[in-house]
Amino acid sequence: LTNAMRPMMRKSVQAGLARLNEAYPGKLTLRISVDHYRTDLHDAERGAGALEKTVTGMKWLRDNNIRMAVAGRSVFGATDEDSRAGYGAFYAEHSFDIDPQDPGMTVLFPEMDETVEVPEITTACWGILDKSPDAVMCSSSRMVVKRKGAATPAVLACTLLPYSEEFELGHSLEEAEKDVALNHPHCAKFCVLGGASCSA
């Protein structure tokens, strides 16, 4: 997950991304935070000029054949259909090869409210929902962050929970190869249920 702005645009980071993409062709996908496809709404969340900087980073990724996905937000009052059409036009304008209709490539997150009650995830849920635990992102993905002032990077289980200590899995990808307990409200709301109900 990246905003594709200054940290990603450092020459050393760009060189590292290019090496990774060359070593593992077709296996690297960067999810870019684009709160909204309209400059005024994105910049209202991220600061003046933010979308322009993100687009510059995305163009670099495009030109270096690094696959992209987008994490957007659905808190601006538009329908899912209208949001996806807007992102589609944004992608077309910049020649970004991202499918706006694929919820895995254009993820639209609702507002995250930890106070909203959600059902507990049980083993029965997987059968009721006809889903597999392997389908949730934390079963196969990790996020590496370097916190300000920290001596080493941290490997997190989930992009939605960057500040929850129980989802910090260590300081290396090897340390982070472990099962993740789905015990946060966001696990149920966003990843497992995704709007479905755990009652048969």
Predicted regions and their residues:
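Active-site glycine- and acidic-residue-rich loops that bind
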Residues: 7-9, 76-83, 135
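Short, electropositive alpha-helical surface patch
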Residues: 80-99
